[in-house]
Amino acid sequence: YQMMEEAGIEITWESQQKFREEMRVKEGQDFILKRVIKNMRQLIDAGQKKIIMDGLYTWSEYKILLHEFPGQVTVVAIVAPKHLRYQRLQNRPERPMQPREIKERDCSENENMQKGGPIAIAEHFIINDGSLEDLHAKLDELTQATHFCKSPMQC
């Protein structure tokens, strides 16, 4: 959002999709990740040992993360049944979407952004088919099972 705001672009679903796709054509599929890696390196330099990154979208981004952080990347895919995902996207308070827009976004994300690859190779999957509290509980369980955190209070 920051780059769009700096460019004076109104933030809508359509403008976000167009902006991301144009930037990926202009600067490469991994343009966002390059900026994120810089921030991650700053966190590491400041002493941070474990970092959670949200929004791994493309296969190119996945390969870059493996190269930048060899042996340190674990991918967790959080997925929801299609009907529930559509319902949530239509009913969300910020930027709700119509079914047509959701279908277009799904096609765009798979065809133009290679989004299926990172999901397919994930080491862990969380099925997000309940409440937000249920999702948080599943995330807490996973962070403990993978020794990312010793307890939810330490994350």
Q: Which role fits each region the language model picked out?
A:
Residues 1-52, 56-64, 100:
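ATP-dependent small-molecule kinase phosphotransfer cores
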